[in-house]
Amino acid sequence: MSYVDGILDKTKDRVHIVERDKDGNRVYRDYPAEYVLYYDDPKGKHQTIYRTPVTKFSSQSNAEFRKEMKIHSNKKLWEQDVNPIFRCLEKNYLVVDAPNLHLCFIDIESDFDEVRGYAPIDDPFNEITAVTVYLAWLGKLITVAVPPKSLTWESASAIAERFEDTFLFHTEAEMLDALLDMIDDADVISGWNSEGYDIPYIVGRVARALAKDDLRRLCLWNQMPKRRDFERYGKKSMTYDIVGRVHLDYMQLYRKYTYEERHSYALNAIGEYELGEQKIEYEGTLDQLYKQDFYKFLDYNRQDVRLLANLDAKLKFIDLANELAHDNTVLLPTTMGAVAITDQAIINAAHKQGLVVPGKKPYSKESVDIMGEDDDDGRAAGAYVAHPKVGIHKYIGAIDINSLYPSTIRALNMGPETIVGQIRPIMTDRYIAEKMKDRLVGKRMMKGPSFSAAWEGLFGSLEYSAVMNMERGTELTIDWEGVEEPTVHTADEVWRLVFESGQKWMLSANGTIFRYDFEGIIPGLLAYWYAERKVLQKKKKEATTKEDIAFWDKRQLVKKINLNSLYGALLNPGCRFHDFRIGQSTTLTGRTIAKHMDSFVNQCITGKYKYDGEAVVYGDTDSISSNSIIRTTKGNMTVEDLFSLGNITWGEGGKEYSRNDDIQICHLNTERNAAEYTNYNYVYRHKVSKKKYKVTDSDGHEVLVTEDHSIMVEQDGKLISKKPSELVVGDVVISL
């Protein structure tokens, strides 16, 4: 058995957990709450991730715990803020499979007031007229409704009978009472924009039509829904969080787990895009539909829920959130963020090694906007993107670095506990500030470049470059971790200190010095996730049934999300492992790797080690397959043909290489601006798990590309990027 949800009862110091067992039964469990803290103590028997001694205090009484915190308030405390629910889940459910959840998809329709119009969620003065739910564990689509006064009861009943499981009620109160009974065995309730509409509206109407005490029927453990104010896209709103029975807004799930931007997130647009299905169309207003065509009104409401159910049947986003929650021992709503789930994953990894993690650093949400455009303080330099060389290019190849940021963190053993020191970025800060200054152009003051734009052309801090160039005349200041007084050295002295002193140290492109005499918790966790994902991908490949393929695919995707989320969490001040130095070390070292990759590729082709050389037309991570036609001295052939004709072959790193020195290929000599035939270095092939698409143009030319390949298309006079699956007949392809 595994958990669905949990709450902390602070009055009784108990953690209440609700489970769903393998037979589909709901089971309630209680655990004593564990309040734990550690404090610095030279004689302590426990060890932090920094390898320093601490002493543990644990109590099942919150009052005793608070008292102990005050006693040790003059000392550094550790883990004093770890959520007792997560601590309970880690202890009791860490290796337990996620349960099969009872899912309920929901959509409501509300009445219209001729004077006041439709009601807002904070004052739901209009009654709910219809509710449709899909109870996935039963496979039933059920509608409850109050018919319009324009119909007799007999006429309305005759219409309702044309649908399966559709029931009419004389009053809204009777209908809502039936709704609460229908959802009683649901674990998760989900709708489209249900956070912003359905849930708060239902809460408001249940309180008015029935009684406030009936709101407890939305929750478990006799709890009441909890009001929560939130802001999204600059607009403030409110909703309610239900307890024990989890609510997940499917629109927000879709936005979170779909990595491409959509032109519209309306249910109709997403249903058409994902399923080829749409909402029921009607003329006039929904109120007119309700009163004038009750049949289509019911059909409209039911179709919305069908779309939701069909979307989840295809996308499985709730199952994905369920796996993520249980893989990291957090609650389902926690997966909608990025910080808390990453925090707990790292905590679990540290605890496996018997190590203690720090408490969170205090910060103000109002003072930090890490992704804001107006405030650049606290932001890290972003990724390097090469300027595209505009035009049509033939024989384009691509190199894709696997998991660049996670691999960079692992390569330099980056973690808060492995930082030795930081070269003060005095020159870099001055340079960036100067670049960002507003400038007077003619008689007009022009706003300076953004923080990101100011980093253009830089692949590391100026201090890092000085060290790597061993500049004797450049003085640098190092702030050492745990040492109050900084030291001053010349850049060449820093190089020798890092690389020739016998210390197991490394230097990031941010000028951060890391140690590697032991593996950091975060690099170790990333290595584990990466290796585990490879195993899961292999099991998916070996699976023979549709169910097994979906099972292993879901699990490997969890690891992918974990890998990709960790870097962003480290740059978020709300993360207990937040450290700007690690974030910028990751991006700048990633830039340096990309620079070397581009330079080396250009050197292989042109002989010049130059990152923006003639052979580099763009920086991207996609790949193109082997069917492009190549002109050779033996005639036109595909890359695959060229590989097959190789008379010199070898294997390396899971790839097969071939070469034939008797065949020359045609390429452009950019110095002479003329085509010429020369020998090629080699052709290699390797297995890929990505889907392939054949793109055929109007002249009959064909090119095979992978599913994640970006194709530039002209649409309405604009250049846009499409994936192969998004192409339609008639698209004007500018470049592949």
Model-derived regions, located:
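Acidic, Mg2+-coordinating catalytic module of metal-dependent nucleases/exonucleases
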Residues: 184-202, 207, 250-342
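A short acidic-Thr-Gly-centered motif at the start of a beta-strand
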Residues: 91-99, 381-395, 608-609, 630, ...
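Common nucleic-acid-contacting/processivity interface regions adjacent to the catalytic cores
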Residues: 288-424, 428-442, 548-600, 605, ...
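Conserved catalytic palm subdomain of right-hand nucleotidyl-transferase polymerases, strongest
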Residues: 106, 248-249, 391-404, 530-533
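Conserved RNase H-like, two-metal-ion catalytic cores of nucleic-acid enzymes
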Residues: 8, 14-19, 24-42, 86, ...
